[in-house]
Amino acid sequence: PPSFILGSSFFYKKGQQLDVGVLRTNLVQAGYGSVEQVMAPGEFCVRGGIVDVFPMGSQAPFRLDLFDDEIETIRTFDTETQRSGDDIDEIRILPGHEFPMDEAARNAFRSAWRETFPGDPNKSVVYKDMGQGIAAAGIEYYLPLFFKETATLADYLPADTLIVLSGDVNQALTRFHTEITDR
């Protein structure tokens, strides 16, 4: 839902005060992984006064250079060479997943799973992985177990947006429905 995306997004700009410990906690709770060297979206690395982060949806990762607890510069960088690139004034970091991964959310997911699906939940890899904080492949199909209300793409668009459908929409919907029910 838009409320989750907005509530789990972070904005940083040059000159801003930054508590690296809070940043690290926020990134982990938003679904980012702490690594030795940032190479792919959803990863971050803290080395002294340097924070590298590759936001979801971004074409390039960013390097925040800190002077004490203030963001001195924000630059893009090359993952292969690790060389800094363009200077940026501010960045937006979106959540790493479309769903929360904190302990309360994982517990709510598991509770909703038990209410929704019959049988022993411990026989499900998805259920067990979520208990360990692992987002299994295809977890996004279980989004309604994380939220009381979900959203569609249309919920993010202005009310007067014109939507044009091309091709055989009914066939695509039938194929998608079959794929989902076969899981």
Residue ranges with predicted function:
Residues 1-183:
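ASCE RecA-like P-loop NTPase motor cores
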